[in-house]
A protein has these predicted regions:
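Generic intrinsically disordered, low-complexity segments enriched for polar/acidic and small residues
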Residues: 21, 26, 74, 99-102
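Short N-terminal micro-motifs specific to bacterial/archaeal maturation
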Residues: 15-16, 46
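Extracytoplasmic/secreted envelope proteins and their assembly/folding machinery
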Residues: 5, 9, 22-26, 52
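Active-site nucleophilic cysteine motif
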Residues: 16-32
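Sec-exported extracytoplasmic/periplasmic mature domains
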Residues: 9-13, 29-34, 63
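...with weaker cross-activation on analogous glycine-rich loops/strands in unrelated enzymes
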Residues: 2, 34-100
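Intrinsically disordered, low-complexity
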Residues: 1-15, 92-105
């Protein structure tokens, strides 16, 4: 899973303008030959249980990102769809929603 994390971290700061959160996750996993749905609801429904390790997908209601294993998430967060790294706790606070859990594919 560290290869997935490395691929996600390499995209931090990119102003892609093309990926929402689930599309970003799907793209990163696809770089490693792993198919992931392009919908946060489908990621939650179809993934296996994870534990927040590096490369796991952290899921909120309507949002997903890739865990770094240290309490942070790499994700596409805002209207500009920039790739950024934030603490999972801050994302939960900003969005006023709790983490549903973690998924692996």
């Amino acid at each position: 899973m560290s290869n997935i994390l490395n691929s996600a971290e390499a995209l931090i700061g990119e102003e892609t303008g093309k990926w929402d959160c689930s599309e970003f996750v799907s793209h990163v996993y696809s770089l490693h030959g792993i198919s992931v749905p392009q919908s946060s609801a489908q990621i939650w429904s179809n993934g296996k249980n994870g534990n927040g390790s590096a490369g796991d997908i952290v899921c909120w209601s309507g949002h997903v990102g890739i865990c770094d294993g240290n309490g942070n998430v790499i994700h596409s967060y805002n209207d500009n769809k920039n790739i950024r790294k934030d603490s999972i706790a801050n994302v939960s606070k900003w969005d006023k929603r709790e983490v549903k859990g973690y998924r692996r594919f």
